[in-house]
Amino acid sequence: LQQQPAKRKADITDCQSIIENHKGQRHRQQEVIESKQTAYFELIAQSTLNKHQQHHYYDVGSQVNVSFGVVRVANIMPCVDLTQYLLKRDWPENTEVRVMAYHSQQVLLLRSLQERHLDKVLKRKEKPGEIPGALNVPVIRQHLTTIKNLSPKIENVLFILVATPVEEVGRDHDFDWAVIEPSSYRSIIQLAGRVKRHRQGEVSEPNITLLQYNWKGIRDHH
């Protein structure tokens, strides 16, 4: 193992400031919970930008930097709330995001269509330096073309999947990077296995971010 190139490296996103900023407040008050959640979601958003900057590739057709990442959250409601937050957030002027929620309580037909789409986009087996096959998927190509036509200043496009543990089992997906809300060692290992799952080549910068605390730990801390 020591002779194998490191395909995955991880860093930790510090969440202590959220606890410090809400110390002494009534942690069960709805406005305090919402304030904590907004701060937590903002840390996640910043982490996605950091990982994109380190692990994107250049699409010649649209002339933008593209990456496909996953944010793993423990529960369905935070998954939905985070997806809405990322969609509404003010991103840098040169950055555009496409965000999709993926969890077990979606309508079965929708989930089936969604999984077929994800399987098509995320079966990444290109070699280092090769153009990702995902860029030839019509839906992805259409997104990139539309973004560039409507906003010529855009230089970065992040495709973000916000997923519950349903992503950890039975899916043969390959992401460029991941942001993980921790639950257990097993869940971390399972999700980390979806980063550069099939592609070879060592990474120099961390392509996985672990959040220091999970949402429940921050929400209930007082």
Language-model-derived ranges and their functions:
Residues 8-9, 14-161:
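Conserved C-terminal RecA-like helicase domain
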